[in-house]
Amino acid sequence: MDLGTANTIIISDDKIVVDEPSVVALDRHTDKMIAVGEKAKMMYEKTHDNIRTVRPLRDGVIADFSACEQMMRGLIKMVHTGHRLFSPSLRMVIGVPSGSTEVELRAVSDSAEHADGRDVYLIFEPMAAAIGIGIDVEAPEGNMIVDIGGGSTEIAVISLGGIVSNNSIRTAGDDLTADIQEYMSRQHNVKVSERMAERIKIAVGSALTDLGDEAPEDYIVHGPNRITALPMEVPVCYQEIAHCLDKTVAKIENAVLSALENTPPELYADIVKNGIWLAGGGALLRGLDRRLEGKINIPFHIAEDPLHSVAKGAGIALKNVDRFSFLMR
């Protein structure tokens, strides 16, 4: 299970059985769950006073404990609807940010146990991503993983089944979305919701102002004028989005550089040889690999299915709990 700020993915028997937004809709009076995942996201930013939609995770860690518990329970229910073949006691491996404090780790395992987990193992996300990408994490050579999620970016150097140096920053996909929201308001005077900003990011988001042949079409944004509230149509091109995302992408660059500074020279040589792996939804930002490569002079590879690499790795770890037990807690 990859419990993410933006999406939660559950893998069971090597299949992705749940891939839903990490959103839950609750009744404001009783705090009962009304909807979870995609259904709740459809309600997000569209609710009246009796319903509140919550994103229980912020910056990669649990911000709203009871909402998170309800969300996990709701998503786990999706896995086995109806047939109670495997009884409620489940073994779970959950990916957590490598910068988590003891309290934050405790919150995740408690939530999982309340949501019917019996043996709950936690694995650090960069480690899970490495296993999911197919890197031999037990080999005596250095590999670097950059996992850019919704709430946090995890950068880790892995060797001999352990994390040698890690850097976890709370700058990630959500910040890119917020940058776009702020930019549209400031530059074009158009109010856009968080979801609209996310659509813009997916349609024309870029880390480079020159994408060459990969350039996406302009995206037409509809929204109210911030001042007059009249409807507007604004075409947005990827160059301007690249400019508005520049500062946030630079923060990620600097975090990668500072992780490299803390890497022992022997492992550094391995990383230059093997390249650096990009995982997480942020790895899909157009031109990010080329921009990082240009800045850092080490080749970057995008994982083949970056959105699911952490969940896949957690799934593999669950199947081989005995082999990977030293990676989990």
Predicted regions mapped to residue ranges:
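Nucleotide/phosphate-binding catalytic cleft detector across ATP-hydrolyzing
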Residues: 1-148, 156-276, 283-329
